[in-house]
Amino acid sequence: GIDENVCTMKLRENIKSPQEADFYNPKAGRITTANSQKLPALRSLQMSAERGFLYSNGIYAPHWNINAHSALYVTRGNAKVQVVGDEGNKVFDDEVKQGQLIIVPQYFAVIKKAGNQGFEYVAFKTNDNAMINPLVGRLSAFRAIPEEVLRSSFQISSEEAEELKYGRQEALLLSEQSQQGKREVADEKERERF
């Protein structure tokens, strides 16, 4: 019965281990999450956790939390963090250091860029299966939007719309030197046609 389920429930998850990373970029860092899929005990708490380890100047792509608020505690290093509210206004734009805590509300966009010494943090989220939506990179929603719509919406050229859609091949963790060549952009466009 229920006693048997509680007694056999997994109660620990190592989110510090590099082998457990959910996202990894050898030039930018790694992100590991603990949610109710990995650790069912979190379902009853309605919480999840994320551990970020960004290398020197690594970037966690701009994204927003779809279904959770986030409390981010810096465990080592420093980073430039920008948070933008749901109406497009900047609500935070500063450096955070070891020992500091920052709250990022649901739907607010956030970007983190590690300092020269790198950046490590733990974020606690108010949903047992917290989800994010990246604004750039291979997993960005912009990839699904036709170029004509992007050009019209943002009043940009065809080249700028193409760069917005295909400019970064990385998924979530970005490095400063990660801009891909035009050939890869063209190859990606060609693949999406089929």
UniProtKB/Swiss-Prot annotation:
Cotyledons and endosperm protein bodies. InterPro entries: 11S_seedstore_pln (IPR006044), Cupin_1 (IPR006045), RmlC-like_jellyroll (IPR014710), RmlC_Cupin_sf (IPR011051), Seed_Storage-Functional (IPR050253). One of its GO terms (molecular function) is nutrient reservoir activity. Residues 13-162 form the Cupin type-1 domain. Keywords: Disulfide bond, Seed storage protein, Storage protein. Pfam families: Cupin_1 (PF00190). Hexamer; each subunit is composed of an acidic and a basic chain derived from a single precursor and linked by a disulfide bond. Belongs to the 11S seed storage protein (globulins) family. Seed storage protein with a relatively high level of Lys and Met. This is 13S globulin basic chain. It comes from Fagopyrum esculentum.
